[in-house]
Structures are given as C-alpha cells and as structure tokens.
C-alpha cells in the first residue's frame, strides 16, 4: 500500500498553557510550508489542520516553477523523486473548439529536473505535511489534526 494512503501520526495534544512562537492554521501546501520554514528558523510552531491526512483535494496535480525551490528547501524533493510521478516538460493549452497551443519549458530546466512534476494532490500534500510535521515536532512544536478553530 502506498505510504501516502496511510494516516500521519502527529503526536500528542500540547498541554494547556503551552506557548508557541507562531500558530499556523491550515496544513495544506501554504500552511505546511509556512510552518516548515518557521520550524527551520528555530521557532516553536503550533500547526493546526481541520482534516486528517491523507485527504484529497481537487487540483491541477502539478508542482513546478518557483514552488520547486520551496519543495527543495523544505526537504521534500528527494522524497518526491522516489514516489510515482510524471515529469513536466511543457504545457498544453486547448480551447473548446479543439485548437491547441504547446509551450515547451526551458530545456535546461527539464534536464536539471527543475521544470516540474505531476502527481496526485493527495500524494504531494502527504509528502509535504509529513515532512513538515517532523520539522515542527523536532523543534519543540506541535501538530494537531481534526481541529477546528472558532474565532
């Protein structure tokens, strides 16, 4: 069974009164990335996600461009390379009347594996969230799943 179909264990609920340098609400790519960078900077983070991993979300299922530098910086690229994926080497635009325009990505980016990847959102989110929850917990933070915030 693929690892991204298995639940992610995120540890215990922090004790009442525990203080954090930052609280990040939302464990999707944006929230996970923010929590990961804060943890790598030595901050004590509380990451709160309303769902439970794994979960799927409607998406274009591609990671590329400037986001690849973050995938690499957060330590996810190597793991992504070891899971099923497609490499993106261009973009195809099509219209309802059947006309198509193909735009190749720069050959040097494709050759360096920096052009992009296509993989299910569930798989990418799982890889990122799992990596970040380790970073957060290793730096004294906590991660909560199935938690709603009411303000």
Regions found by a protein language model. Give the residues of each.
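Extreme N-terminal leader/targeting segments of oxidoreductases
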Residues: 1-22, 37-41
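Glycine-rich Rossmann-fold phosphate-binding loop(s) that bind the pyrophosphate
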Residues: 26-28
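N-terminal Rossmann-fold NAD(P) dinucleotide-binding loop
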Residues: 31
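Glycine-rich FAD pyrophosphate-binding loop
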Residues: 39-59
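N-terminal FAD cofactor-binding segment of flavoenzymes
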Residues: 58-96
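Short beta-strand to alpha-helix junction loop
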Residues: 109-130
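A conserved beta-strand/loop element that lines the FAD pocket in flavoprotein oxidoreductases
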Residues: 134-147
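Conserved small/polar residues in nucleotide/adenosyl-binding loops
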Residues: 149-151
